[in-house]
């Protein structure tokens, strides 16, 4: 069985320097590395750009150098935030010229470029907003269904814009698709669920599937982060749509009444 090193679980590498990262990878000699460690809070990154750059650019570059030196296949997570600032509608392909408008997106785009310069066979996965439910005793950050459930429980509202469009992905599909992703040719891939609905409609659909009543406040910001998945599909890897994904999630947890 091949040894795969997954970063991002304990925070060890995020606190380490380049020498420690290199030493760890040389010692473990993995056949592949899945680099999932990141500082992904966009607001925090905006307020702490140097820390964001270290975690989201410098660290993965160190990992890439060590991966190349050891011969390990590298798979690293990027983000749909690289598309922040794109004004065109519809699903966005990987080939678009990009100028992200937030610190996190700029860091992720720089990371992609620098990692591919070092390791042309590295696979960079642009992930969307992801979610799971708290059924495995694992820490879970705020996500769409949890935010809706908390709002319903406490009688508070959630805010979304009808001009905001993005995919929302069930994280266990991301996990299931990692093994085939390790066999992809080097390059950048959109990696998540498609969505033809705006975020107001998406939140309403999730609330309906969860069988809860939630007050949704309308905002007026405009954003399109919907990713085109054709490149990934041509390689044989597919995701549910955003709407199919929440139903898949509820079935997995035995909560789908259909």
Regions found by a protein language model. Give the residues of each.
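NAD(P)-dependent short-chain dehydrogenase/reductase
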Residues: 113-166
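SDR active-site strand-loop-helix element
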Residues: 7, 33-37, 74-80, 86, ...
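NAD(P)H-binding glycine-rich loop region in Rossmannoid oxidoreductase-like domains
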Residues: 22-55
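N-terminal Rossmann NAD(P)H-binding glycine-rich loop of SDR-like oxidoreductase domains
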Residues: 1-17
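Conserved Rossmann-fold NAD(P)-dependent oxidoreductase catalytic core, especially the SDR/UDP-sugar
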Residues: 61-99
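Mid/C-terminal beta-alpha module of Rossmann-like enzyme folds, strongest
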Residues: 177-178, 183-223, 228-229, 258
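Amphipathic terminal alpha-helices
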Residues: 2, 242-258
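Glycine-rich NAD(P)-binding loop of the Rossmann-fold in SDR/ketoreductase-type enzymes
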Residues: 47, 51-62, 98, 102, ...
């Amino acid at each position: 069985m091949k040894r795969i090193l997954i970063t991002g679980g304990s925070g060890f590498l995020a606190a380490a320097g380049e020498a420690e990262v290199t030493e760890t990878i040389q010692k473990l000699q993995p056949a592949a590395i899945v680099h999932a460690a990141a500082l992904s809070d966009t607001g925090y990154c905006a307020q702490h750009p140097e820390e964001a750059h270290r975690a989201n650019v410098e660290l993965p570059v160190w990992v890439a150098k060590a991966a190349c030196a050891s011969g390990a296949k590298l798979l690293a997570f990027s983000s749909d935030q690289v598309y922040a600032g794109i004004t065109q509608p519809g699903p966005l392909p990987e080939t678009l010229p990009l100028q992200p408008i937030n610190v996190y997106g700029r860091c992720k785009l720089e990371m992609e470029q620098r990692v591919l310069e070092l390791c042309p066979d590295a696979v960079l996965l642009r992930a969307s907003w992801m979610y799971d439910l708290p059924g495995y005793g694992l820490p879970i950050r705020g996500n769409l269904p949890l935010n809706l459930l908390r709002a319903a429980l406490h009688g508070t509202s959630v805010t979304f814009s009808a001009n905001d469009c993005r995919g929302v992905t069930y994280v266990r599909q991301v996990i299931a698709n990692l093994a085939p992703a390790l066999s992809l040719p080097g390059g950048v891939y959109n990696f998540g669920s498609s969505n033809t609905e705006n975020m107001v409609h998406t939140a309403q659909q999730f609330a309906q599937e969860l069988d809860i009543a939630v007050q949704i406040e309308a905002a007026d910001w405009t954003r399109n982060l919907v990713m085109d998945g054709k490149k990934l599909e041509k390689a044989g890897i597919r995701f549910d749509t955003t709407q199919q994904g929440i139903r898949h999630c509820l079935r997995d947890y035995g909560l789908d009444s259909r």
